[in-house]
Amino acid sequence: MAGGEAGVTLGQPHLSRQDLATLDVTKLTPLSHEIISRQATINIGTIGHVAHGKSTVVKAISGVHTVRFKNELERNITIKLGYANAKIYKLDDSSCPRPECYRSCGSSTPDEFPSDIPGIKGNFRLVRHVSFVDCPGHDILMATMLNGAAVMDAALLLIAGNESCPQPQTSEHLAAIEIMKLKHILILQNKIDLVKESQAKEQYEQILAFVQGTVAEGAPIIPISAQLKYNIEVVCEYIVKKIPVPLRDFTSEPRLIVIRSFDVNKPGCEVDDLKGGVAGGSILKGVLKVGQEIEVRPGIVSKDSEGKLMCKPIFSKIVSLFAEHNDLQYAAPGGLIGVGTKIDPTLCRADRMVGQVLGAVGALPEIFTELEISYFLLRRLLGVRTEGDKKAAKVQKLSKNEVLMVNIGSLSTGGRVSAVKADLGKIVLTNPVCTEVGEKIALSRRVEKHWRLIGWGQIRRGVTIKPTIDDE
């Protein structure tokens, strides 16, 4: 943060000021100007089969390339969840025809700029600030997506116009959206520049048939070309008109699920210049403020002399908050937020804190080591290509002592099934997790060397452990 008075943002002077002294959380909404000027308040997932153009669409709308890692660029696939924020603007001159009156820009663009359309005056004004969660498309990475989906308000389902619909992962992702109870979906028929008009129409019929009876039934289908940025402003218009602004809770104690964490210090840094670890995640509820005392659970996990699990929550203080390159004084629920802390950076490096929960001291949920869940299994394995007209493999029932992968919030951990009834199961977790009764979890099983989604469950109750807190 640039110097000056504490509690007032001074970085990016062209954006709206945030002042902690005058902050009244009861008056905030997901469209409050001082919030959307600097951070996203709506999360939209991009889902669909591999190489159907999910990352390209995000880049066309936000200008940010979500493929950040070298091995991802070379293989042209997204492995970690990518995030990109975009501001959506609407021209205030009503004589401008739709969809030209909508425009999208990166998150550090000023909140208002003059029209550059010939013959039309007026200003483009900021109406939404959205965050795209670019989900990996491969089925092994399905778990990553269910983790990311813990914080999605809507989804863009991408279908490539030059392949038949549906492709295996398209159906697997639709199933994941149903599990997540996402109601708001836009279907984008991409790569429209590569096919004849008749092919596009034929595929449009295929898409309609495919989504019938699913959550995506009745969703708008927009033909686009992400590479040529064709029809992108139509997507912006639909995001504004069709995706309702989610109801958010600004007044509860804040809680953030950590999806990324890193050490920002360069090697060879002087001791006095060391910065604390940074945790990145999406705030589920409440407002985090610079200077606030925080707690991270489960914290440091170890075993005592008898081999029993112990958790020692980490206590720290927020020294900075940011959304992409924008400094914040306070952060609200919505897009990905970076939280600069005073935590020992080695605890944060290379995503070590993923799956932890950060929030106000003493207000976080319990830490569980065993869960009792009510669960539902899918009838068939999703996304497996089957030879000829054989149906996809059936999902076998849960068996006692088998090991599953359990996804809770942003944590993926192993779990051994210790008891199982018709629709109730007990699972002993490999890693303790901070969660609460009623949370949804996803279950995956190893099938032919890959983790495949087999069902989901809801936490009924469980065995919790008391965190160890140093008596200082």
From Swiss-Prot:
Enzyme Commission number, as recorded:
3.6.5.3
Question: InterPro entries, per this entry?
Answer: EFTu-like_2, eIF2G, eIF2g_C, eIF2g_dom_2, eIF2g_GTP-bd, P-loop_NTPase, T_Tr_GTP-bd_dom, Transl_B-barrel_sf
Report the protein name in the record.
Eukaryotic translation initiation factor 2 subunit 3, Y-linked
Region annotation (G4) ranges: 190-193
Q: Write down the chemical reaction(s) this protein catalyses.
A: GTP + H2O = GDP + phosphate + H(+)
Q: Which PROSITE patterns match?
A: G_TR_2
State any single GO MF term.
Answer: GTPase activity
The region called G2 is annotated at 76-80
According to UniProt, the tissues expressing it are described as: Widely expressed in males.
The UniProt keywords, alphabetically, are: Acetylation, GTP-binding, Hydrolase, Initiation factor, Nucleotide-binding, Phosphoprotein, Protein biosynthesis
Its gene name is Eif2s3y
Identify which top EC class this enzyme belongs to: hydrolase
Source organism: Rattus norvegicus
Q: What does this protein do?
A: Member of the eIF2 complex that functions in the early steps of protein synthesis by forming a ternary complex with GTP and initiator tRNA. This complex binds to a 40S ribosomal subunit, followed by mRNA binding to form the 43S pre-initiation complex (43S PIC). Junction of the 60S ribosomal subunit to form the 80S initiation complex is preceded by hydrolysis of the GTP bound to eIF2 and release of an eIF2-GDP binary complex. In order for eIF2 to recycle and catalyze another round of initiation, the GDP bound to eIF2 must exchange with GTP by way of a reaction catalyzed by eIF-2B.
